[in-house]
Curated annotation (Swiss-Prot):
Residue stretches in coiled coil: none
A GO biological-process term: mRNA splicing, via spliceosome
Modified residues (N6-acetyllysine): 36
Annotated stretches, region: Disordered: 1-28, 225-308
Keyword Nucleus: yes
GO CC entries: nucleus
Chain's role: May be involved in pre-mRNA splicing.
UniProt protein name: Protein FRA10AC1 homolog
Feature: compositional bias, Basic and acidic residues: 236-245, 257-279
List of residues that carry Phosphoserine: 9, 12, 251-252, 283, 285
Gene Ontology molecular functions: phosphatase activity
Provenance organism: Rattus norvegicus
UniProt keyword terms in alphabetical order: Acetylation, Nucleus, Phosphoprotein
UniProt-listed Pfam families: Fra10Ac1
Amino acid sequence: MHGHGGYDSDFSDDEQGGGSSKKRKKTVEDELLLTKPFQKEKYGKVAHKQVAADLLDREEARNRRFHLIAMDAYQRHTKFVNDYILYYGGKREDFKRLGENDKTDLDVIRENHRFLWNEEDEADMTWEKRLAKKYYDKLFKEYCIADLSRYKENKFGFRWRIEKEVISGKGQFFCGNKCCDEKEGLKSWEVNFGYTEHGEKRNALVKLRLCQECSFKLNFHHRRKEIKSTKKRSKTKTESDESPHKNSRSSSSEEASQGKDEGHSSSKRSEDSRNRNAGEEDSASDSELWKGPLPETDEKSQEEEFDDYFQDLFL
């Protein structure tokens, strides 16, 4: 018995239960209609362990990627090596590079350098030869720098000048011996330089500028060819060679000038005679004007002109 006037109903609970179920259906339908196609499902419960592990792995991978990007190549290499040793074992000496066969650019140039490059040398060009050829092209090959330390053994060393030596004047305005900086009394010498390079014997004519003491060292065994300035001699020779030509040119020019003078004089004479004739004619005409009045001329009338014209036609 319930306390509402002593009345009770068996259908009251069923009606209340039916209304709540309808409300639930409406809410589910509304949620289905309002959900977007790209919207993720809502977890009303605690996430599964696998889902949580995947999220953690993804976050860790993102952090590791940012960490590796911040490193340079050497730091990444050391990190990977340390990780390999930590996870798989091994010794650190196994990862050390052997530097016995390492070569710098200077070593490559020393191995492949040539005092003079020929067309045959440029046939098969490797990257080492190209590097040596590039260095050779930057050298200045007018004067040489000499090593005269073993002049008593008749052994000399020659090399081309570099840009720094060209700017400072070493080898041209200063002595070409690498251990001498004398700049007075320099002489130019031409040396037939014989050398062996890459198993081949070659010769090259080399110019040197040396002081007196270094010239004595160069010519210790036999005298080399000295290069003297031939500008004055060449000038005197050219002047002597050109003198007969100059004389002939001067004589021909005099004859031409004489001919031109004669031509000018004759032309002047003709012009003078013409001017005289014109002046005489003008003076005659002026004198005739002042002699008296002009004679009267009878002008024919138009009829008389017609009569004369027709008379000539009918004759």
